Amino acid sequence: FGATLLRDASEEELRSKVYAVDTDPGYIRDTTAWPMGDLVPDTVDTGIDRTAINEIAGKLMDDTVYGGIPFAFVVLHKGIPVAEKYRPGLGKDTRFLSWSMAKSFTNAVAGVLIRMGNMDISEPAGVEEWKNDERSRITLNDLLQMQSGLEWNEDYGSRSDVNLMLFDKGDMSRFAVTKPLEHPAGTQWTYSSGTANILTSLIRNEFDSDTSCYAFVHDNLLEKIGITDAVFEVDPSGDLVGSSYLYATARDYARFGLLYLNDGVFGGERILPEGWVDYTRTPASASEGKYGALFWLNRSREYPSAPEDMYSCQGHDGQMIFILPSSDLVVVVLGFSHRPDNALDFDGLLRDILKTI
């Protein structure tokens, strides 16, 4: 499952790379209780109006009420799935492309490494190409908050940096690290998929092989939160494409949101460092309150009907994981929902969901 573009490597070279990562969870998901498995309780009263929330799910898939072209919808209240709806032909086992929601998973992988003492966000990133110039001052925190100061163009409608990186480069992080410094580190916020791929390259450098890196991500993050068959795609160089290319089910995206809702703890086990979620939700100083550490924030009230403490993973074309701590909610919406002529009304959807509590 998944694909890698043929760039700077032959098909024979890529097919010769075999990564032996054991992804067998050792249990059957359909007969294992939520959240580690897919056996969902239908009798737990969380205090939400289930009839109303499921009416909203039906209206969402109607297309004409909230707009957009949604593919999947999952709502957790107090950790329990209370609504789930899919477009015909899709279902709970369908894996959906994350696009930039993958950046938030990169945050989580970094968090696990930091909990284990392998990385320090206050330290310089240590990129070899930067060691003899001002870029040597860029810290992991600057990269996580997208305040590296590196020149970057994230315009998807042109031959931009992001399009060149994703579709024309065999080693995406190498392309990103060559960008010159445009602003002093920590002083300017610039949304950059290049930054996320620099981070995944630094993560890869913590291991002695590609296989060890992939196994670490699976064993210490994904499997720990019940995600057993997600695919984190790699570029031809072997680095995880931490900016854009993760495939997972809607339930798995909900599990990921639940990890953050529960302050980095899942099933009673601490996965992320204590204080990591608070750090993640702290606005980057130059972001005007809209961005934390590879998560979007609602401090600037982009979604006025939602509480200010809401934060989210967001991907191209409207892939969303909304996390609402004060309402004990996780809302997953996947699909094709950002067309200018038919954008999904996420604020209206959130408003109506909140009315059901």
Language-model features: locations:
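Active-site Gly/Thr loop motif
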Residues: I227-V234, R281-V330
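Active-site-proximal alpha-helical segments within enzyme catalytic domains
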Residues: N107, T195-I203, S244-V265, Q319-G335
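Conserved catalytic neighborhood of penicillin-recognizing serine enzymes
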Residues: K131-S160, M165-T187, G194-N197, A248-R251, ...
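N-terminal leader/targeting segments and the immediately adjacent pre-domain N-terminus
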Residues: F1-G91, Q145, T356-I357
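Short active-site loop at a secondary-structure junction
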Residues: T64-A72, R87-N118, S122-K131, P184-Y191, ...
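Active-site SXXK
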Residues: G79, F96-D120, L143, L199-I203, ...
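Active-site helix/loop module of the DD-peptidase/beta-lactamase fold
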Residues: R115-E151, T178-P180, D208-S244
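Short, charged, amphipathic alpha-helices and their helix-cap/turn boundaries
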Residues: T51-A52, K59, I80-K85, R159-A185, ...
